[in-house]
Design a protein with these regions (language model features):
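Primarily the internal scaffold of c-type cytochrome electron-transfer domains
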Residues: 28-33, 54-93, 122-129, 137-390
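N-terminal secretory signal peptides that target proteins for export/translocation
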Residues: 1-7
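Short N-terminal segments immediately surrounding and downstream of signal-peptide cleavage
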Residues: 27-48
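Aromatic-flanked redox-active Cys/Sec active sites in thiol-based oxidoreductases
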Residues: 42, 47, 111, 128, ...
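Bacterial N-terminal signal peptides
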Residues: 11-22
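Cys/His/Pro-rich metal-binding microdomains
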Residues: 43-51, 107, 132, 174, ...
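Post-signal peptide N-terminal segment of secreted/secretory-pathway proteins
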Residues: 92-132
């Protein structure tokens, strides 16, 4: 190829890369559990001069006591040991899967359950959800990381997972706190005794014991999103994953679809008191198994706050979805696919949108209005609304 043409191609490639958002540049990032990198084990991070200091170091760009925080205060460090208690033993017995702490279906989310070939010399499955379960196998990036001369971008290029990016963090967290195309907590697993899964990205990020500090140095090296943006991205991705699961699992071979994707309270409620009341946003009467639309509700409100016409359109499509559950399964899956596609479009939209004070005010007004209209009478809707208010006011 002539040199002048090659130079033009290089310039074009550089220009194209410069126009991409961080989200687009990280688009091909593989979740830590599914990458080919070797996971070296928690102890590779736990040295007293690495991340195992008993207290934060003064003058360091990081706290240095991250391992201690995780080990003592973070529930992720106890995720494996939960599989050894009597409740988990009974669940495993109910499911007929052998021992819970040996079953892949349990280990996939209660531990850093990478393939045997990707486990280093001191790796221990009993460490639970450890460092590399979230930050990625350290085979390629750990040496750079401890060298003191590599940039954060160098580490990312070598396989460090970008947890600071809200989109990638949502994909990571949701892979266990909801599920992905390889693992999911089904209604059968819940029937065996597993608790209901709930999740909201910004709230769960804030309530996890922080082993980092968002200071000047952090801002210089990493992506920082505000609470409302993180919340909005989390809602869109959670809905996308729910519809992807619905479309993949479809009708499970029996007469029912996968019920874990529907609202638990539609069936699991007291029969001693009459609590049902109509919800305007569903168009449904009593006795119907409702699709869990809690993320849809939040997205309607977010969109109404920044793009009123699109928000109203989403509201109408939500009613279409609910009505189709009682009339036509083909129509139900058609609307579900359309809503899945829309949720996917909203992720980059929210990533690039600059949420400001006026957006927060509009959103709070919309939330209050929907509350008065009894849209949050369902537990899951009220739960997401409360976490949303906390996120946008933080």
């Amino acid at each position: 190829m002539p040199k002048v043409k090659l130079n033009h191609l290089l310039i074009a490639a550089i220009f194209f890369a410069a126009t991409l958002s961080p989200l687009q540049l990280l688009a091909d990032t593989v979740l830590p559990q599914y990458s080919d990198d070797v996971h070296l084990g928690v102890t590779s991070c736990a040295g007293s001069t690495c991340h195992g200091a008993t207290s934060p170091w003064k003058g360091s760009t990081v706290l240095q006591n991250e391992y201690i925080t995780w080990d003592r205060y973070d529930p992720h460090s106890k995720a494996y040991s939960v599989l050894l208690n009597d409740v988990s033993k009974q669940m495993a017995k109910n499911l007929g899967i052998g021992k819970a702490h040996e079953a892949k279906i349990c280990l996939d989310c209660h531990a850093d359950n990478v393939a045997e070939k990707n486990r280093g010399r001191v790796f221990q499955i009993s460490d639970g959800v450890g460092c590399e379960a979230c930050h990625g196998g350290g085979e390629r990036w750990l040496g750079l990381h401890v060298s003191g001369v590599a940039s954060h971008q160098d580490n990312l290029d070598a396989g460090l997972y970008p947890t600071e990016d809200p989109v990638k963090r949502a994909e990571l967290c949701l892979s266990c706190h909801f599920g992905d195309d390889k693992k999911i907590v089904t209604h059968r697993i819940m029937g065996a005794g597993h608790p209901r899964l709930d999740f909201e990205l910004d709230t769960f990020t804030a309530t996890q014991p922080a082993h980092y500090e968002i200071d000047k140095d952090y801002y210089e090296r990493k992506i920082v999103s505000n609470g409302m943006q993180t919340w909005a991205i989390g809602q869109a991705l959670a809905l996308e994953k729910r519809f992807e699961a619905l479309l993949k699992m479809g009708e499970t071979g029996g007469i029912f679809p996968e019920l874990v994707l529907f609202d638990c309270q539609a069936c699991h409620h007291s029969l001693m008191t009459q609590k049902w009341q109509p919800r305007p946003g569903t168009g449904l009467g009593p006795g119907v198994v409702r699709f869990d639309d809690s993320n849809l509700l939040m997205l309607q409100i977010i969109l109404e706050s920044i793009d009123a016409a699109r928000g109203k359109a989403l509201q109408r499509k939500t009613v279409e979805l609910h009505k189709a559950t009682t009339t036509n399964s083909k129509e139900f899956y058609r609307v579900a696919q359309s809503l899945r596609d829309e949720a996917k479009e909203l992720v980059p939209m929210f990533s690039n949108y600059k949420f400001g004070k006026k957006d927060v005010e509009n959103l709070l007004r919309k939330l209050i209005k929907r509350t008065k209209e009894a849209e949050f009478f369902d537990y899951v809707g009220a739960e997401q609304a409360i976490m949303g208010i906390t996120s946008v006011l933080a």
